[in-house]
C-alpha cells in the first residue's frame, strides 16, 4: 500500500498522544499517588496481570537507591509509564481495588471493580484465587490486630501499675529531698566545726612553735652550763692534786720532827761522853805509870801491844773515816733520792693533770661533735619538716578540692542509686503484678486467639524477628509488655528477643526440662500465691522453655534468671522482712542487716524451702576477675551451707567445770525417732545435763516410762541417715534439740532418774541465776555488729564471752555475756548469731574482703541486701545426689580452698587484720572440739568426695571457725614477756633493763651445751629457744630457766619469737605477748631501736610478715598502737603499763590450737 506508511505513522502518533494524555493525568496527581501508595500491595496484582516481571518487582522493592516508600512508588510509576496504555489500564484497576479514593481522584469516576485485565489474562479462576489470597491476608492482619489489642490492654494495665508506682516514687523523692536538705544543714554545721577545729589546730601549732623556741633556748643554756661544769671539774682536779702533794710533804716533815731526839736525851748523852773521856784519861795515866815500873820484858810486850794498839787505832780510824765517807755518801744519796722523789711527784702531778685535761678536752670535743651532729640533724629535720609541711599543705589543698568533688559526686551517686533502687523495687512489683495477671488471663488469652492461627505467626511474635518478605514493613506498635527499665536492671538477652507471653509458654511447656512434679506443684500453689508478695527469686522461678533457656546470660545473676522451678511459699523472705520491719527507712534498707530477720525460721521451714542463690552472685564480675565462675561459687556456698547446718556447735567436756557424781542405775528404752520431737520437750544444757521437761500424755514416750525430771544420757540410732551415738549429757541445748529433731527409725534413749538435779535446774532458772543449762566460754574470730548482724550485742574480734543459752527464745541465737578481763565476771548481756549462722557471716565477710576494690562493687550495692537474705538462710542444702552438686564437688572444694588461700596471703591478712571487718582465720584440726562438729557435719559429703578424688583435702579446707572454745587459767607469779616483731625484741629488752627496770625485769640465763647434749635434750625435753654459738656448742633456754626467773618474782624478757608460745603453754608457762604495731605513720620512730640499718620498706615488709603469726596464737595478745607513744621513752613506759595490765588479766587459752 503506497499510502500505508504515512497513515500508520499518524496512527501511532495519535496513540502516543492519547497515552501521553492519559499519563498526563497521572503525572498531575503523582505527588498524591507516590505519597499514599504502598508498592508492596500493588506489585502482586501487577505481576499477575503480567505488566511487570520479577526483576521489575525486585528493583522497586529492594533497590538500595530507593530508601523511602515515596521513591519506590515513583519508580513503580516510571516503570508502568514505559508499558504504555496497558500499564495505565492495569495501574488504574489496581488503584480501583486497593485505593478507591485515589482511583476517583485520577479518573473522576466511581470504582466498579470489574478486573477486566486479570479476567482476560488469568480467567475467572485466577481472579478468584487472587481474591482468596487477599482475603487470607486480611484475616491474618485482623488476627494480628486482635492480638495487638490484647497486648495493648495488658500494656494499659501495666501503665496503670507504673502510674501507681510513680506516685510512690514521688513520695519517696520528696522524702529524699527533705533528707537532702537536712544533710546539707548538717554539712554546713560540720563545716563550721571544721573551721573551728582548724583554728584550734593553728593555735596549737603556734604554741608548739613557741615551745620549740623555748626548748632550743634551754638547750643552749644547758650547753653553756655544761661547759662551765667541765671547767670547774678541771680546777677541782688540779686543786686535789696540789692538796695531795702538800699533804705528802707535810707528813714527811712532821715525821722528821717527831723522830728528832729530845733535849734531855742530848744533855744526858753529852754527860756520858764527858764521863767516858774522863775515864779514858785516867786509864791512859794508869797505863803510863805502869810502863815506868814494869821490867824490860814486860816493856817489850807493852811496846808490842802499844804498837798493835796504834795499828788497831789506825785501822779503826780508817774504818771510822770510811764509815764517815759512807755516811756522807748515804746522806748525799738520800738527798738525791728525796730530790728525785719530789721531782717524781711533781711529774706525776703534771701527768695526772695533763691526763685529766686530755680526758676533759676529749669529752668536750665529743660533746661538741654530738651537739654539732644533733644541730645538723635538727637542721636537716627542720628543712625536711618544712618541705614536708609545704608539700603536705599543697597536698591537703589538692585533696580538699578532690574530696569536695568526690562528696558532690557521691551525693549525686547516692541520690541516683536510691532512685534506681526505688525503680527496681517498682520493677519487681511490676513483674509480680504481671505474673499474677498472666496466671489469671491465661485462659482468656487461649480464647482470644483464633484456633486456626498458623504457627508461623506465633513464631514470628515470640521468636527471632524474621526478615520481611516482599518489602512489607513492621507493625506500627510493639507487642512487648516489658517495661522500658527492664534492660537497665536485668541482664540483656543475647541476641535481643521479644519477651514470651503465656501463650508461647504453653505451646512448648511439654518440652521443658523441668520435672513435671515441680510444675504441678507450682500450678497447684499458684492461687495461694496471688494475695502475697513474692520475692524476686520466686518471680523468676517459672518453668520456662528450652528456647528461653538459650536466651539466658552465660552466668547467673540472681534467682530471677534461675532455671530451677522453686514455688514461693508463705515464708517469703522479702514479705517477712517487710512485715517484721515496716517502719524501717530506706537508708536502713541499704545496710546489710535486713537479711537476718528471716533467719528465725524453724527447722521445718528449713527443710521445706530452699531459697535463692547466695551472696556470692552479688559480685559476679569480681569473681570473674579472680578466675572463678558464678556456678562454681554457687556450689561452694551450697556445700558450706550444708556443712554449717549439719550439726550445731559442741563444746568439749573439758570446758565445763561441772563434775557429775555417780547417780542411780542407768535405764534405757526404744522409741520411734520420727515422732520423738512431738512427744517430749527438753530442758538443760552442757553444764547441767539434758532433762525431760514434759511428756505428751498418752504418747509412746510416756508408755515407755519417760517422765519429767529424767536425765538423758545417751541416744543411739539413725540420725540423718547415719548410725550414731550422741552423749546427750554433754550436749548443748541447741545440739540436743537438733539431734532429737533429726532422728529417724527406732532409737534407744539411755536415761536415769535425777529429780534433784532437775529441781535445782528449774529453781535456778526461776530465780534468774541461769538462763539455761548451757555454760562455756568462746573467743570471737570476727567482728559482730548489733545493727548489721541481726543481734543485740556488738563485739570485736578476740573478745571473750560467756555463752549462757544456745537457743535463746527458741531462735537461732546465743545468749551470752561479755566477760570482764580482770575478774571473769559477766558484764552486759545480749545475743549473738549461732555457730552455723556465724560461719555464714564469716564467709560473707571474707567475700567482702576478697571483692574489695572492684570497680563493680558500687554497681552491685543494690544486691547486698538481697544477697545477704539469700545467703544467711538456715536452709537445708541440696542432697549429695543432686546432679548439679556431685559432679563438681571436687571443683567447688578446690575453689573454696582457693578462697581461703586468697584471704590467707600476707598482704590480705594485713588488710583483714587492720580493717573494720576484721576476721581471724585459724586452721581447724579434726581433733579440736570446734572442728569435731565440723568433721561430723562433713563426714557424709567427704565420703562422696573421696569416691571422686581419694586425695581430696576437703575436710582440711573447710575450717571456717567463727568462735573458738577457750578455757581460763590463772597465774600468780610474774609471767614471761615475748615481743613481736622479733627484730625489736633485743633492743627493747636492753632499754627496759637500762631504764631502771632491773627490779621488775630480767633476762633469762641460758644453758651452754655441746651439740650431742643439745640433740639429746631436744628429744627428751622441751627447748623454748636455741641458738648455735659455735659449731660445737649451743645456747638454749628450757622451761626450767624461765621458772627460775619467775621464782624471783620478776618478768623474764625473752628475745625469742612468738613461735615458742605453744611450747610455753604446754609447759604450764603462760607468756605475755606484746605486739608493737608498725605502720607507715610511725616507722620513722623505730630508727633508734633497729639493731642494724635497714630500709623502711624492708622493715615494714618484715613486720607485716611477722604480724600474720598472731592469728595462730592459742592465747590473747596485747597491742601497742602507734598513737600511744611518740618517743622511745614513752614506748618503754607504755610497754611497762601493758605488761602490768596483762599480768592482772585472766589468761584465756584455746586448747584446740595447742
Curated annotation (Swiss-Prot):
Q: Where is the composition biased (Basic and acidic residues)?
A: 518-529, 573-587
- Positions the record marks as coiled coil are 130-449
> Which residues does the record list as Phosphoserine (modified residue)?
448, 466, 512, 535, 559, 593, 644, 652, 886, 925
Alphabetical list of CDD domains matching this protein: CARD_CARD11_CARMA1, PDZ_CARD11_CARD14-like
Location of region: Disordered: 460-626
Which stretches are transmembrane?
none
Source domain of life is: Eukaryota
Q: Where is this region: Inhibitory domain (ID)?
A: 450-666
Comp. bias (Polar residues): 534-562
**Residue ranges constituting the PDZ domain according to the UniProt record:** 667-755
Effect noted on mutating residue 123 to S: In BENTA; results in protein aggregation; constitutive activation of NF-kappa-B signaling
Q: Where is the Guanylate kinase-like domain?
A: 973-1140
Q: Relate the outcome reported for changing residue 975 to W.
A: In IMD11B; no effect on protein abundance; dominant negative effect on NF-kappaB signaling; dominant negative effect on TORC1 signaling
Q: How is it modified after translation?
A: Phosphorylation at Ser-559, Ser-644 and Ser-652 by PRKCB and PRKCQ leads to a shift from an inactive to an active form that activates the NF-kappa-B signaling.
Reported effect, residue 134 to G: In BENTA; results in protein aggregation; constitutive activation of NF-kappa-B signaling
Give the UniProt keywords, A-Z: Coiled coil, Cytoplasm, Disease variant, Disulfide bond, Immunity, Isopeptide bond, Membrane, Phosphoprotein
A single BP term in Gene Ontology: positive regulation of interleukin-2 production
Coiled coil: is it a keyword of this entry? yes
Q: In what way is its activity controlled?
A: Maintained in an autoinhibited state via homodimerization in which the CARD domain forms an extensive interaction with the adjacent linker and coiled-coil regions. Activation downstream of T-cell receptor (TCR) by phosphorylation by PRKCB and PRKCQ triggers CARD11 homooligomerization and BCL10 recruitment, followed by activation of NF-kappa-B.
One Gene Ontology molecular-function label = CARD domain binding
Q: In which tissues is it expressed?
A: Detected in adult peripheral blood leukocytes, thymus, spleen and liver.
The annotated subunit structure for this chain is:
Homodimer; disulfide-linked. Homomultimer; polymerizes following activation, forming a nucleating helical template that seeds BCL10-filament formation via a CARD-CARD interaction. Interacts (via CARD domain) with BCL10 (via CARD domain); interaction takes place following CARD11 activation and polymerization, leading to the formation of a filamentous CBM complex assembly. Component of a CBM complex (CARD11-BCL10-MALT1) complex involved in NF-kappa-B activation. Found in a membrane raft complex, at least composed of BCL10, CARD11, DPP4 and IKBKB.
Query: Which disease shows up in the entry for this protein?
Result: B-cell expansion with NFKB and T-cell anergy: An autosomal dominant condition characterized by onset in infancy of splenomegaly and polyclonal expansion of B cells, resulting in peripheral lymphocytosis. Affected individuals also show mild immune dysfunction, including some defective antibody responses and T-cell anergy. There may be a predisposition to the development of B-cell malignancy. Immunodeficiency 11 A: An autosomal recessive primary immunodeficiency characterized by normal numbers of T and B-lymphocytes, but defective intracellular signaling. There is a block in B-cell differentiation with increased numbers of transitional B-cells and hypogammaglobulinemia, as well as decreased numbers of regulatory T-cells and defects in T-cell function.
Q: According to its record, what is known about the domains?
A: The linker region, also named autoinhibitory interface, is less inhibitory on its own than that of CARD9. The linker region together with the inhibitory domain (ID) are required to prevent constitutive activation and maintain CARD11 in an autoinhibitory state. Disruption of the inhibitory domain (ID) region triggers polymerization and activation, leading to formation of BCL10-nucleating filaments.
* Protein known as: Caspase recruitment domain-containing protein 11
Amino acid at each position: 500500500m503506497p499510502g500505508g506508511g504515512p497513515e500508520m505513522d499518524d496512527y501511532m502518533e495519535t496513540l502516543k498522544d492519547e497515552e501521553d494524555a492519559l499519563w498526563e493525568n497521572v503525572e498531575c496527581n503523582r505527588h498524591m499517588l507516590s505519597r499514599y501508595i504502598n508498592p508492596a500491595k500493588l506489585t502482586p496484582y501487577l505481576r499477575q496481570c503480567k505488566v511487570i516481571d520479577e526483576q521489575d518487582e525486585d528493583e522497586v522493592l529492594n533497590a538500595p537507591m530507593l530508601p523511602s516508600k515515596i521513591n519506590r512508588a515513583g519508580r513503580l510509576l516510571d516503570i508502568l509509564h514505559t508499558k504504555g496504555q496497558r500499564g495505565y489500564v492495569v495501574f488504574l484497576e489496581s488503584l480501583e481495588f486497593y485505593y478507591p479514593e485515589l482511583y476517583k481522584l485520577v479518573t473522576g469516576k466511581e470504582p466498579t471493580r470489574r478486573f477486566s485485565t486479570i479476567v482476560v489474562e488469568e480467567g475467572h479462576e485466577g481472579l478468584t484465587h487472587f481474591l482468596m489470597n487477599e482475603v487470607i491476608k486480611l484475616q491474618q492482619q485482623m488476627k494480628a490486630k486482635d492480638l495487638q489489642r490484647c497486648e495493648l490492654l495488658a500494656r494499659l494495665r501495666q501503665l496503670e501499675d507504673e502510674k501507681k508506682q510513680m506516685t510512690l516514687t514521688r513520695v519517696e523523692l520528696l522524702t529524699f529531698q527533705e533528707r537532702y536538705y537536712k544533710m546539707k544543714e548538717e554539712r554546713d554545721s560540720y563545716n563550721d566545726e571544721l573551721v573551728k577545729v582548724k583554728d584550734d589546730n593553728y593555735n596549737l601549732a603556734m604554741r608548739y612553735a613557741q615551745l620549740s623556741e623555748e626548748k632550743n633556748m634551754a638547750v643552749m643554756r644547758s650547753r653553756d652550763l655544761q661547759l662551765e661544769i667541765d671547767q670547774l671539774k678541771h680546777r677541782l682536779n688540779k686543786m686535789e692534786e696540789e692538796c695531795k702533794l702538800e699533804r705528802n710533804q707535810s707528813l714527811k716533815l712532821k715525821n722528821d720532827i717527831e723522830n728528832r731526839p729530845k733535849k734531855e736525851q742530848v744533855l744526858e748523852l753529852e754527860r756520858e761522853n764527858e764521863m767516858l773521856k774522863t775515864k779514858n784519861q785516867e786509864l791512859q795515866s794508869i797505863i803510863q805509870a805502869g810502863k815506868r815500873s814494869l821490867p824490860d820484858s814486860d816493856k817489850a810486850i807493852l811496846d808490842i801491844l802499844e804498837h798493835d794498839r796504834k795499828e788497831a787505832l789506825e785501822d779503826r780510824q780508817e774504818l771510822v773515816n770510811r764509815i764517815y765517807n759512807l755516811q756522807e755518801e748515804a746522806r748525799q744519796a738520800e738527798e738525791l733520792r728525796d730530790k728525785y722523789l719530789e721531782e717524781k711527784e711533781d711529774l706525776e702531778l703534771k701527768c695526772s693533770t695533763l691526763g685529766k685535761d686530755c680526758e676533759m678536752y676529749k669529752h668536750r670535743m665529743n660533746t661538741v661533735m654530738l651537739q654539732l651532729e644533733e644541730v645538723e640533724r635538727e637542721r636537716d629535720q627542720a628543712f625536711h619538716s618544712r618541705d614536708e609541711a609545704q608539700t603536705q599543705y599543697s597536698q591537703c589543698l589538692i585533696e580538699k578540692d578532690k574530696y569536695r568533688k568526690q562528696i558532690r559526686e557521691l551525693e549525686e551517686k547516692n541520690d541516683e542509686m536510691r532512685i534506681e533502687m526505688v525503680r527496681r523495687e517498682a520493677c519487681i512489683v511490676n513483674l509480680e503484678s504481671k505474673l499474677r495477671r498472666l496466671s489469671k488471663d491465661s485462659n482468656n488469652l487461649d480464647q482470644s486467639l483464633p484456633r486456626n492461627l498458623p504457627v508461623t505467626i506465633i513464631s514470628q511474635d515470640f521468636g527471632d524477628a524474621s526478615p520481611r518478605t516482599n518489602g512489607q514493613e513492621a507493625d506500627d506498635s510493639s507487642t512487648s509488655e516489658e517495661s522500658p527499665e527492664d534492660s537497665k536492671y536485668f541482664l540483656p538477652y543475647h541476641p535481643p528477643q521479644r519477651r514470651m507471653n503465656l501463650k508461647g509458654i504453653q505451646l512448648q511447656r511439654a518440652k521443658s526440662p523441668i520435672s513435671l512434679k515441680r510444675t504441678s506443684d507450682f500450678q497447684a500453689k499458684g492461687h495461694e500465691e496471688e494475695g502475697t508478695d513474692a520475692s524476686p527469686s520466686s518471680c523468676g522461678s517459672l518453668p520456662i522453655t528450652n528456647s528461653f533457656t538459650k536466651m539466658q546470660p552465660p552466668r547467673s545473676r540472681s534467682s530471677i534468671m534461675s532455671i530451677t522451678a522453686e514455688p514461693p511459699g508463705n515464708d517469703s523472705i522479702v514479705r517477712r522482712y517487710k512485715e517484721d520491719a515496716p517502719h524501717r527507712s530506706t537508708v536502713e534498707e541499704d545496710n546489710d542487716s535486713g537479711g537476718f530477720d528471716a533467719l528465725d525460721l524453724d527447722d521445718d521451714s528449713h527443710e521445706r524451702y530452699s531459697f535463692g542463690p547466695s551472696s556470692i552472685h552479688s559480685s559476679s564480675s569480681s569473681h570473674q576477675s579472680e578466675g572463678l565462675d558464678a556456678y562454681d561459687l554457687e556450689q561452694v556456698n551450697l556445700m558450706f551451707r550444708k556443712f554449717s547446718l549439719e550439726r550445731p556447735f559442741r563444746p568439749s567436756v573439758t570446758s565445763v567445770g561441772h563434775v557429775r557424781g555417780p547417780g542411780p542405775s542407768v535405764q534405757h528404752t526404744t522409741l520411734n525417732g520420727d515422732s520423738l520431737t512431738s512427744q517430749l520437750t527438753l530442758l538443760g544444757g552442757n553444764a547441767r545435763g539434758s532433762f525431760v521437761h514434759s511428756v505428751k500424755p498418752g504418747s509412746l514416750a510416756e508408755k515407755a516410762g519417760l517422765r519429767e525430771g529424767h536425765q538423758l544420757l545417751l541416744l543411739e540410732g539413725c540420725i540423718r541417715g547415719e548410725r550414731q551415738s550422741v552423749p546427750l549429757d554433754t550436749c548443748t541445748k541447741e545440739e540436743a534439740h537438733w539431734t532429737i529433731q533429726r532422728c529417724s527409725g527406732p532409737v534407744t534413749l539411755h536415761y536415769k532418774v535425777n529429780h534433784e538435779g532437775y529441781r535445782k535446774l528449774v529453781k535456778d532458772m526461776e530465780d534468774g541465776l541461769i538462763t539455761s543449762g548451757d555454760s562455756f566460754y568462746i573467743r570471737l574470730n570476727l567482728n559482730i555488729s548489733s545493727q548489721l548482724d541481726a543481734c543485740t550485742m556488738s563485739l570485736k574480734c578476740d573478745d571473750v564471752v560467756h555463752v549462757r543459752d544456745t537457743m535463746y527464745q527458741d531462735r537461732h541465737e546465743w545468749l551470752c555475756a561479755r566477760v570482764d578481763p580482770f575478774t571473769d565476771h559477766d558484764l552486759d548481756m545480749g545475743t549473738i548469731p549461732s555457730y552455723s549462722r556465724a560461719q555464714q557471716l564469716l564467709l560473707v565477710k571474707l567475700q567482702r574482703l576478697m571483692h574489695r576494690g572492684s570497680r563493680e562493687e558500687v554497681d552491685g550495692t543494690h544486691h547486698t541486701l538481697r544477697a545477704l537474705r539469700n545467703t544467711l538462710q538456715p536452709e537445708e542444702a541440696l542432697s549429695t545426689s543432686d546432679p548439679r552438686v556431685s559432679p563438681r564437688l571436687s571443683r567447688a572444694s578446690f575453689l573454696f580452698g582457693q578462697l581461703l588461700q586468697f584471704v590467707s596471703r600476707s598482704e590480705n591478712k594485713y588488710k583483714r587484720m587492720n580493717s573494720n571487718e576484721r576476721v581471724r582465720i585459724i586452721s581447724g584440726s579434726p581433733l579440736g572440739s570446734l572442728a569435731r562438729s565440723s568433721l561430723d557435719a562433713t563426714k557424709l559429703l567427704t565420703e562422696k568426695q573421696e569416691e571422686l578424688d581419694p586425695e581430696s583435702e576437703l575436710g582440711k579446707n573447710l575450717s571456717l571457725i567463727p568462735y573458738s572454745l577457750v578455757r581460763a587459767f590463772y597465774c600468780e607469779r610474774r609471767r614471761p614477756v615475748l615481743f613481736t616483731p622479733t627484730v625489736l625484741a633485743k633492743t627493747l629488752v636492753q632499754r627496759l633493763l637500762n631504764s631502771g627496770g632491773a627490779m621488775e625485769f630480767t633476762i633469762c640465763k641460758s644453758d651452754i651445751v655441746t651439740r650431742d647434749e643439745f640433740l639429746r635434750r631436744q628429744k627428751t625435753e622441751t627447748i623454748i629457744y636455741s641458738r648455735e654459738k659455735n659449731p660445737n656448742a649451743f645456747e638454749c633456754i628450757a622451761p626450767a630457766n624461765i621458772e627460775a626467773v619467775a621464782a624471783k618474782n620478776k618478768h623474764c624478757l625473752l628475745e625469742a619469737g612468738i613461735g615458742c608460745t605453744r611450747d610455753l603453754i604446754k609447759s604450764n608457762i603462760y607468756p605475755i605477748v606484746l605486739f608493737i604495731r608498725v605502720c607507715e605513720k610511725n616507722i620513722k620512730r623505730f630508727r633508734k631501736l633497729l639493731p642494724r640499718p635497714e630500709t623502711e620498706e624492708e622493715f615494714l615488709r618484715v613486720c607485716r610478715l611477722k604480724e600474720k603469726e598472731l592469728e595462730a596464737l592459742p592465747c590473747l595478745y596485747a597491742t601497742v598502737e602507734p598513737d600511744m607513744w611518740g618517743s622511745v621513752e614513752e614506748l618503754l613506759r607504755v610497754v611497762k603499763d601493758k605488761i602490768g595490765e596483762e599480768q592482772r588479766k585472766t589468761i584465756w587459752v584455746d586448747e584446740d590450737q595447742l
